[in-house]
């Protein structure tokens, strides 16, 4: 326990383990700042952010500014008199006026090994790009996009078949552990902030649904990485008989054919030709249907070798 007045800023499930860790350590979390409640899912039911739920379970006051950069939002946070602000996956850019409020600055927990993968979606992009290692970095925030001085890093391997959901769950715990270590070592005066080398950076922009469209002319391993990095959201997809087909689990194989051509169908999956090699789709979801293992899908949908997956209304694969 540091004894500091801490304001916690975060929104999604990824931030919850870090907030719980602060609470379990007995830290004085004087308020939680999170995004407004928003409609979610098919029913568009208005739901609170996961971080808000955790805060309310522990009786911590919650602020939900629509725009944290507005003067009234900044003054409300200033009125909390924080010694430190901890930020993890908050979802809005913090202005300098807010960063300057706490006595000991603002610490961000970022889900990559900075300076690589600055930006909103580091978990997705490190998998899409075929990385075999990633990690978490704590840093002192400045006005740039994940450009602040680094405090600590902790790395973790990425499994060959691991998707974003699995990596998310592990990294959220890793981030909580690293923040606790960061606070302890800062209190002992053991940490010296390290400048980032901008020459080594790459960016991880926010994911868009259209990023999930599979180009079957690409290499099979590259498409597998895309599927892994897009699962569970926004989802990798193609089209079958002009219907959207989401693809969730695949394995590489050595088949050949026209890109997007269905090579075989069986209990183990649906093999589809790529630009180089092939992919066996093990789990999928056709538009308007449930997510199913390939064998169960084929029991209700008559798919034949020689068919094509590709863009909607296309007569050939992408």
Curated annotation (Swiss-Prot):
Keyword entries, A-Z: Protein biosynthesis, Transferase
Binding positions for (6S)-5,6,7,8-tetrahydrofolate per the UniProt entry: 112-115
Domain of life: Bacteria
Catalytic reaction equation(s): L-methionyl-tRNA(fMet) + (6R)-10-formyltetrahydrofolate = N-formyl-L-methionyl-tRNA(fMet) + (6S)-5,6,7,8-tetrahydrofolate + H(+)
Record-listed E.C. numbers: 2.1.2.9
InterPro entries with a match to the protein in the record: Fmt, Formyl_trans_C, Formyl_trans_C_sf, Formyl_transf_N, Formyl_transf_N_sf, Formyl_transferase-like_C_sf, Met-tRNA-FMT_C, Met-tRNA-FMT_N
Enzyme class: transferase
Transmembrane segments: none
Pfam family, one: Formyl_trans_N
Function: Attaches a formyl group to the free amino group of methionyl-tRNA(fMet). The formyl group appears to play a dual role in the initiator identity of N-formylmethionyl-tRNA by promoting its recognition by IF2 and preventing the misappropriation of this tRNA by the elongation apparatus.
Protein name per the record: Methionyl-tRNA formyltransferase
The species this protein was found in: Citrifermentans bemidjiense (strain ATCC BAA-1014 / DSM 16622 / JCM 12645 / Bem)
Gene that specifies this protein: fmt
């Amino acid at each position: 326990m540091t004894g500091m007045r801490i304001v916690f800023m975060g929104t999604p499930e990824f931030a919850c383990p870090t907030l719980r860790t602060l609470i379990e350590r007995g830290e004085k979390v004087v308020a939680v700042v999170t995004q407004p409640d928003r409609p979610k899912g098919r029913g568009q039911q208005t739901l609170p952010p996961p971080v808000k739920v955790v805060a309310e379970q522990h009786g911590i006051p919650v602020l939900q500014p629509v725009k944290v950069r507005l003067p009234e939002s900044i003054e409300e946070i200033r009125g909390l008199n924080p010694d430190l602000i901890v930020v993890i996956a908050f979802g809005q850019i913090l202005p300098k006026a807010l960063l300057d409020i706490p006595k000991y600055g603002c610490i961000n927990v970022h889900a990559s090994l900075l300076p690589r993968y600055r930006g909103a979606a580091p978990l997705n992009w490190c998998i899409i790009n075929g990385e075999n290692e990633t990690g978490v970095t704590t840093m002192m925030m400045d006005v740039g996009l994940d450009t602040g001085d680094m405090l600590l890093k902790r790395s973790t391997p990425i499994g060959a078949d691991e998707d974003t959901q699995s990596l998310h769950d592990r990294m959220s715990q890793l981030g909580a552990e690293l923040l606790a270590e960061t606070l302890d070592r800062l209190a002992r005066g053991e940490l010296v902030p390290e400048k980032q080398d901008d020459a080594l950076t790459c960016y991880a922009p926010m994911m868009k649904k259209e990023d999930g469209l599979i180009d079957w002319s690409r290499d099979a391993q590259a498409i597998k990485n895309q599927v892994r990095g897009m699962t569970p959201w926004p989802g990798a997809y193609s089209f079958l008989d002009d219907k959207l087909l989401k693809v969730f689990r695949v394995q590489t194989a050595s088949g050949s054919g026209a890109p997007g051509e269905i090579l075989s169908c069986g209990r183990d999956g649906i093999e589809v030709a790529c630009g180089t090699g092939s992919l066996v789709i093990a789990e999928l979801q056709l538009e308007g249907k449930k997510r199913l293992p390939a064998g169960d899908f084929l029991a209700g949908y008559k798919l034949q070798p020689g068919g094509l997956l590709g863009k909607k209304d296309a007569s050939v694969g992408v």
